[in-house]
Amino acid sequence: MHGHRAPGGAGPSEPEHPATNPPGAAPPACADSDPGASEPGLLARRGSGSALGGPLDPQFVGPSDTSLGAAPGHRVLPCGPSPQHHRALRFSYHLEGSQPRPGLHQGNRILVKSLSLDPGQSLEPHPEGPQRLRSDPGPPTETPSQRPSPLKRAPGPKPQVPPKPSYLQMPRMPPPLEPIPPPPSRPLPADPRVAKGLAPRAEASPSSAAVSSLIEKFEREPVIVASDRPVPGPSPGPPEPVMLPQPTSQPPVPQLPEGEASRCLFLLAPGPRDGEKVPNRDSGIDSISSPSNSEETCFVSDDGPPSHSLCPGPPALASVPVALADPHRPGSQEVDSDLEEEDDEEEEEEKDREIPVPLMERQESVELTVQQKVFHIANELLQTEKAYVSRLHLLDQVFCARLLEEARNRSSFPADVVHGIFSNICSIYCFHQQFLLPELEKRMEEWDRYPRIGDILQKLAPFLKMYGEYVKNFDRAVELVNTWTERSTQFKVIIHEVQKEEACGNLTLQHHMLEPVQRIPRYELLLKDYLLKLPHGSPDSKDAQKSLELIATAAEHSNAAIRKMERMHKLLKVYELLGGEEDIVSPTKELIKEGHILKLSAKNGTTQDRYLILFNDRLLYCVPRLRLLGQKFSVRARIDVDGMELKESSNLNLPRTFLVSGKQRSLELQARTEEEKKDWVQAINSTLLKHEQTLETFKLLNSTNREDEDTPPNSPNVDLGKRAPTPIREKEVTMCMRCQEPFNSITKRRHHCKACGHVVCGKCSEFRARLVYDNNRSNRVCTDCYVALHGVPGSSPACSQHTPQRRRSILEKQASVAAENSVICSFLHYMEKGGKGWHKAWFVVPENEPLVLYIYGAPQDVKAQRSLPLIGFEVGPPEAGERPDRRHVFKITQSHLSWYFSPETEELQRRWMAVLGRAGRGDTFCPGPTLSEDREMEEAPVAALGATAEPPESPQTRDKT
């Protein structure tokens, strides 16, 4: 409990009646000096707080401890003899238990180790008293009669800590001015260990932060011995003089004047400034961003030199060495006056710097700055041109000259190698050294009269196109340097000798060879910057813009040369891939795409691995061949882009297929993935489009040729023999496509007509004719094609068969034509009721006859085996007693007639059931059944209509859903 100050504030009032302290509160201090108060007992290290650290309660503060936490207006009870000076030591301890005090309630007591007697005075031993650890809660209350048994400890006084040597007590130099980082958003929490042992108190004064920082300083750094002078704590009002009770043997501590006390309080605990945070007063610790070194605290010493006061506060105060004002010490006023004079001088200098410049002067300086920027860019162009010419001189007159001399005199390596490395570097060097650089130097000398460079660049920029040849040859030149450096020792020696010279700048030959490649883009960047800095309406703007366009054209010319060289490298790789068989290295030829692909055989439809190489003018069809040096390819066919057509395959059973038809040959190709097919189709289409645009540009495509190109190859208007036909696979035909006789492997073998691509028998292909697309070589053709090419033969055994005009059967409907315009078509396995086995056939429902089902032996047959009217048939799954031996089986029934069908997939089964069900009801057809119709057909069979209708003679109109 705190004692209250007397109304007069001069002397201490009577002590309050003893009472039990509330939980967590500190016990009352002793009323008078106790010889055992300074005796060391069982000590416990305190987490935070000591004589100079953390806010201390008034009852634990000695007579001279007002500056350490005793707020004005509180009574401070003495606890023994009070010295004038205290020694600040590194340690702080807690001591509990001592002799009971008469008249006061005995509780826990704290012995502060950092408060001691004079430097030469030693601690006197005191009799042992009962002691216990601070952490031991002990009994809740104690009476004077209750006294715990004393603990045993070693006899003898506690050793005194020796003072610090004088050379270690020198004041430290202030740290340099540095901005203090911003504090955290909220203060740090108080130490819970301190809250347990300290009594509840009012709001701590700002000086508690400085005291707490002293504790941290003593715990981290060596001991600094200094004398403390009482400093009153801050108060809301004007500071009042604090009267401390002093023993009769000691003189009273002199009080500071009001002004000096305020100055010390400001230095010890400054208030918050603008933009700063208030320190954490509860914990006695500043923000984590505030410096916590030893310079934060403030010391007052009577004997030693003035210490530096670097308290937390504004940087201007924290960085200047300050001595606390002492009215009895001379020189303090002089120090303050010197500091004030220096601050005044700095403020005057800053004001002089901030004198505003008149408006007219600022405008003139801005105009001069624009002119200077333009001049600097032009001067930069000149300086970089000088450095560039020196590099060209090094390449042409040093590297190239020495290598040519060695090649011509000693023949250590061919002279062609040197010419291949340096290309036209001699012409580039002459242009820059004799033309461009002198013009720029002359213009910069006359810059005051002619401040422009656009006219010079406009005149000489077209000559920069010569860089295209050098850039195109750069990769080959670097490769030659690397190759001959390893192959020829003398070549390597010359290169290394030149690279060691000072003019080379410790760079390799390859680095210097790269500079001409980078020079034109640098011209472009400098000229763009020059145009940006030119003032509006400058006379040089037009010439500079024109020069920029010419330089950009030269840069594009160089880039085009680079791209052309890259294309040439690709052509060379393909040339090596083909083993030199095909002459494809040409400036006009460009590689578009290459890669593996599957080719479908024209006879049996098997897949074969092939390699396609697409150029801008032709397609190479290659087959792989094995060699000792690796896999190479041989060209099997060459298809020109002129006249090439790309089609999608109509065969549903072969996914990812497409057809390439050209004048020389037609190929049916299959990709391994959908992405691969998409890439090939896109590449071929883009090539065809570019070729068409080229023909239109040069007006080489007339109207007649356009009709021939736009006409499908198999149409009757095509001139036979001028382009390769699309061959029909032999397995897709079961009969001769001319005489309609069925094939067999012995008497009726299959042959292909090289003019139309149809599959015919031997009797129908006895003629031979020269075909234009095959370089006028003789090929087997059918009778109809021979008649179209050469007219009716005079004596031909096959001619008599075609002379009489026979009546055409209703079944003579070509399957391929019907399939192209059909509602649905696919292979199905079928079996009639009572049949012995399943048969495979090609079924088609044509669009022009949607109520009739045609059955073909193969997709390319010219005549159907039979036809089946669908009206009146009911579609449904097989009955429970019928156990077909195939999957996805459904049947159509009418009266006593039943047909069983088995598609390959379940999706195909749903589509066929939907189409046949609608045809059985006599409905018209849409291109394909909807998903809802498929589900309805899957869930329940469709009831057939009893009415019948005649087959329509004209094509039916389909419903559009």
UniProtKB/Swiss-Prot annotation:
Its main location: cytoplasm. GO terms for biological process: actin cytoskeleton organization; animal organ morphogenesis; cytoskeleton organization; filopodium assembly; regulation of cell shape; regulation of GTPase activity; regulation of small GTPase mediated signal transduction; signal transduction. InterPro entries: DBL_dom_sf (IPR035899), DH_dom (IPR000219), FGD1-4_PH2 (IPR035941), FGD1_PH1 (IPR035939), FYVE_RhoGEF_PH (IPR051092), PH-like_dom_sf (IPR011993), PH_domain (IPR001849), Znf_FYVE (IPR000306). PROSITE patterns: DH_2, PH_DOMAIN, ZF_FYVE. A motif (SH3-binding) lies at residues 171-187. A zinc finger (FYVE-type) spans 730-790. It is found in: Cytoplasm; Cell projection, Lamellipodium; Cell projection, Ruffle; Cytoplasm, Cytoskeleton. Expressed in fetal heart, brain, lung, kidney and placenta. Less expressed in liver; adult heart, brain, lung, pancreas and skeletal muscle. Residues 1-11 have a biased composition (Gly residues). Keywords: Cell projection, Cytoplasm, Cytoskeleton, Disease variant, Guanine-nucleotide releasing factor, Metal-binding, Phosphoprotein, Repeat, Zinc, Zinc-finger. The modification Phosphoserine is found at residues 48, 205, 715. The modification Phosphothreonine is found at residue 711. Residues 125-135, 273-284 have a biased composition (Basic and acidic residues). The keyword NADP does not apply. Residues 590-689, 821-921 form the PH domain. This is FYVE, RhoGEF and PH domain-containing protein 1. Interacts with DBNL/ABP1 and CTTN. May interact with CCPG1. Binds CDC42. Residues 335-351 have a biased composition (Acidic residues). Residues 373-561 form the DH domain. Residues 27-38, 199-213, 285-294, 316-325 have a biased composition (Low complexity). GO terms for molecular function: guanyl-nucleotide exchange factor activity; small GTPase binding; zinc ion binding. Zn(2+) 2 binds at residues 753, 756, 782, 785. Residues 156-165, 172-190, 231-255 have a biased composition (Pro residues). It is linked to Aarskog-Scott syndrome: An X-linked recessive, rare multisystemic disorder characterized by disproportionately short stature, and by facial, skeletal and urogenital anomalies. Some patients manifest intellectual disability, attention deficit disorder and hyperactivity. Activates CDC42, a member of the Ras-like family of Rho- and Rac proteins, by exchanging bound GDP for free GTP. Plays a role in regulating the actin cytoskeleton and cell shape. The DH domain is involved in interaction with CCPG1.
